[in-house]
Amino acid sequence: MAEKLKVDLVTPYKKILSEEVDEITATGALGEFSVLPGHAPFLTSLKIGELTYKKGGQFFHLAVNWGYFEVEDDKVTVLVETAERADEIDLERAKAALGRAEAALKGLSPEDKSYKTQEAALERALIRMQVAGKSTRK
């Protein structure tokens, strides 16, 4: 059994991460899950949420936006629409997005076509703010 997981995280635009890590945690469609070396193979969808990995005793946090997570032979492949490291998130921009989404939702009912879109924008903004709060930047 390997002592590390090889993780590749990519978006349609670029490779965000290619590291050997001790463990990784993400938010799947059925809830949060963690993977350690030696985990059984599986494939799941991801929802808007936080992805955290541990490397050398330190935790790193990213905000991710929908995608897929696959484990096979101690290799983890994460394909997501977007991913931002905690220290790359513009907190003011996330707060502004939250305000816009909240304002838009006030004028909509759940039956409106754009309700789900605005609800997702709200969720993305909240996750980005949560993850930004875990940044190691000074």
Curated annotation (Swiss-Prot):
It comes from Geobacter metallireducens (strain ATCC 53774 / DSM 7210 / GS-15). F-type ATPases have 2 components, CF(1) - the catalytic core - and CF(0) - the membrane proton channel. CF(1) has five subunits: alpha(3), beta(3), gamma(1), delta(1), epsilon(1). CF(0) has three main subunits: a, b and c. This is ATP synthase epsilon chain. The keyword Cell inner membrane applies. The gene is atpC. GO terms for cellular component: plasma membrane; proton-transporting ATP synthase complex. It is a peripheral membrane protein. One of its GO terms (molecular function) is ATP binding. Its main location: membrane. InterPro entries: ATP_synth_F1_dsu/esu (IPR001469), ATP_synth_F1_dsu/esu_N (IPR020546), ATP_synth_F1_esu_C (IPR020547), ATPsynth_dsu/esu_N (IPR036771). Produces ATP from ADP in the presence of a proton gradient across the membrane.
